[in-house]
């Protein structure tokens, strides 16, 4: 199945209500971005990072992806709140990626989690 669609994981929406994710630049959780080939199949029901169909190591890209740099959330209007991440680059990499998954490696209890965003 080809990699299709854009999703905000339903589990992430619930976890926001549980205050499980901290996006602050200072003291916030660690988020990573993993890259996937065209065989990856994610839906809104995706709950965790998986190595299945992740692209191979190349240059500075390694299994599990790269750590993102948190940017403090902001409220640009009365009805919108956003968060962002700094630019992530993988040098000397030759990769054919068709999609990505952002996930939290420190959600809730501290370390070792792989909750998808």
Regions found by a protein language model. Give the residues of each.
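Small cysteine-rich, disulfide-bonded extracellular modules of the LU/uPAR three-finger superfamily
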Residues: 1-98, 105-117
